[in-house]
Amino acid sequence: MDNTQAEPLVVAIVPKPNASTEHTNSHLIPVTRSKIVVHRRDFPQDFIFGAGGSAYQCEGAYNEGNRGPSIWDTFTQRSPAKISDGSNGNQAINCYHMYKEDIKIMKQTGLESYRFSISWSRVLPGGRLAAGVNKDGVKFYHDFIDELLANGIKPSVTLFHWDLPQALEDEYGGFLSHRIVDDFCEYAEFCFWEFGDKIKYWTTFNEPHTFAVNGYALGEFAPGRGGKGDEGDPAIEPYVVTHNILLAHKAAVEEYRNKFQKCQEGEIGIVLNSMWMEPLSDVQADIDAQKRALDFMLGWFLEPLTTGDYPKSMRELVKGRLPKFSADDSEKLKGCYDFIGMNYYTATYVTNAVKSNSEKLSYETDDQVTKTFERNQKPIGHALYGGWQHVVPWGLYKLLVYTKETYHVPVLYVTESGMVEENKTKILLSEARRDAERTDYHQKHLASVRDAIDDGVNVKGYFVWSFFDNFEWNLGYICRYGIIHVDYKSFERYPKESAIWYKNFIAGKSTTSPAKRRREEAQVELVKRQKT
């Protein structure tokens, strides 16, 4: 590993807005950039630097150890055409068999915490206790957690990362039924009993917005409803699914707080995701569109957890298709978390959309907003592979400030932040490990987090997505997010330059950026050639 000492990289972030800025004026937060040097010492001593992965994306061993099938097993195997390369997570990156080696790499990289999910169908193959507990699956997670702890890495556990047991989907439609609330609560309680004395950070759901929209409005994720298919109703089902997720979250948090939190001394929250929505112009209609867009993505979940009901804009536009909370549920939802995890990848411009004349209603058009990555023919940020992600570090800053000011969230973690790149299969390993752009990405986003902290947002951790290259849902293996390169055929792991940077950053060392180092090496080589 290269531990060359050098001047730290200078990156650009947004300046601090006026502390009195109201959330209704979030579009006024300036985006002019200033320069700042990012160090480990800029963050609080108890700030956690980690990385993440999830069960279906990493474990593999889909039919080993008495694991039951999940909806992602069914989706990928029955509908391979919906995956970009026709692949699946049957083997994923083989973490089930390689976890000890993987955790050794985590320790070498200096991770302070690793965020992972439990496969519901690996511990409860039939989805509930009455259908039987899988002792092999329970042992695997005990061994995995124990190995993390033995290596000084804090486990951060997600209970649901989209891989619902197929048994519950078959029995009653999974999250389309209110019955899921009791079954999820039972599963959560089982995990609290089984693993809770070792876990200090619990997350009920990861990105419920993605699960509800991609799985029930677009048909691109399991269980594949909505979209162009005949199954599902994209005007109703995403709202029903989200409603049941919120009630299941509430039930699990109540269970943890009432029975476990005092003795286990852990925290429990939920991980949400949102793009930052920037008004396309200063016209009031676009400013209003910004608020609606944020309501429909972030407020859909945070408003009930703050006020006990959905955003006013959603009530007005979705009307009777939006479920209602009982008075008791509404009251108990308020403050039903210890922390909020925020997954951030990109930002977009938004403008007011003309109401669709289409007779087919959908969540996708209910907000009456048009999104675009360009303004005056200039992109909002550098476009990455696939075109959906643009590098917009200041969007993370604005999102954190907006979340704190609008919803008064006391504790935030950036639970995912990462950069997509193409899986280039015909390049040398040495080239595949060169990812200076990823290092630059994380430097700039960490700078935005630091600036948000300076402005009073209580951010307590940053988790790189992802630690390993892995199976990326409907994109299969055509792209990579990891700071550790994985050979998808041999499963060999190799640290990328970004992993070496992250190791040194966490350790508080100054490092030459990979791009700068290569420029210096090229300059030395040029001088040598000139002398000869």
Curated annotation (Swiss-Prot):
Family: Belongs to the glycosyl hydrolase 1 family.
Enzyme Commission number(s) of this protein: 3.2.1.105
Keyword flag Membrane: no
Tissue expression per record: Mainly expressed, at low levels, in roots and, to a lower level, in leaves.
The protein's name in its UniProt record: Strictosidine-O-beta-D-glucosidase
Coiled-coil annotated residue ranges, if any: none
Function statement: Glucosidase specifically involved in alkaloid biosynthesis leading to the accumulation of several alkaloids, including ajmaline, an important plant-derived pharmaceutical used in the therapy of heart disorders.
UniProt GO MF annotations: strictosidine beta-glucosidase activity
Result after altering residue 386 to S: Reduced affinity and activity
Annotated region described as Disordered, given as residue ranges: 512-532
Annotated catalytic residues: 207, 416
Acetylation among keywords: no
Pathway this chain belongs to: Alkaloid biosynthesis; ajmaline biosynthesis
First-tier enzyme category under EC: hydrolase
Keywords, sorted A to Z: Alkaloid metabolism, Glycosidase, Hydrolase
